[in-house]
A protein has these predicted regions:
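Intrinsic disorder/low-complexity segments enriched in small, polar and charged residues
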Residues: 4-5, 11
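A generic fold-level signal
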Residues: 26-28, 40, 54, 106-109, ...
Length: 176
């Protein structure tokens, strides 16, 4: 290595790169959950209308923060229970991540996506975060989704969780 060249055998010294470029943090502080219910041989997606200030009156799927000491899948089960009152669900990791950039705080938010299958008899009881809910087809959910990118996640879930059985390796055996 030549003194001051910033390379070792042609590879940039990462310390020097970090001193010359701005790093934007990536935060994984929450989870996203897509609940599926079969109706007449077709899966429907639970979409919730937001009542809070953020994304007010927009349709979204379940999501929320991960509490201190909690695993992501535990947060997913808790958010399902808190936002919908649903207590019986077969949960899977979607092996996907929801992500967006926050210009106000200059960071990238990322959240693991989970998929839950619920029995058609499970009632939905909304909490204060939502004003309405609908079980939508995948096309309806994509059309009504609040943010760009959600359609890609819904396409993935439809392909790998609705049109065929999910991989047994993605099953999560936790309890609500």
């Amino acid at each position: 290595m030549k003194r001051g060249s910033g390379t070792v055998d042609g590879v940039k010294d990462t310390k020097q790169v970090n001193q010359t470029k701005q790093v934007i943090p990536i935060r994984c502080e929450g989870v996203a959950v897509i609940l599926l219910k079969k109706n007449l041989d077709q899966y429907h997606v639970l979409m919730l209308k937001r009542a809070s200030r953020m994304l007010h009156n927009e349709w979204c799927y379940i999501g929320g923060g991960i509490e201190m000491g909690e695993k992501a899948w535990e947060a997913a089960l808790r958010e399902i229970r808190e936002e919908t009152g649903i207590t019986e669900v077969r949960l899977y990791s979607a092996n996907q991540f929801e992500q967006y950039y926050s210009p106000m705080e200059d960071y990238t938010y990322t959240a693991p996506v989970f998929v839950g299958y619920v029995d058609e008899s499970q009632p939905v009881q909304l909490n204060h975060e939502h004003s309405d809910y609908q079980w939508m087809t995948f096309d309806e959910a994509k059309e009504n989704a609040a943010l760009p990118g959600i359609d890609h996640i819904l396409d993935f879930v439809e392909k790998h969780f609705a049109k065929k059985a999910p991989s047994k390796w993605l099953r999560i055996d936790g309890k609500i």
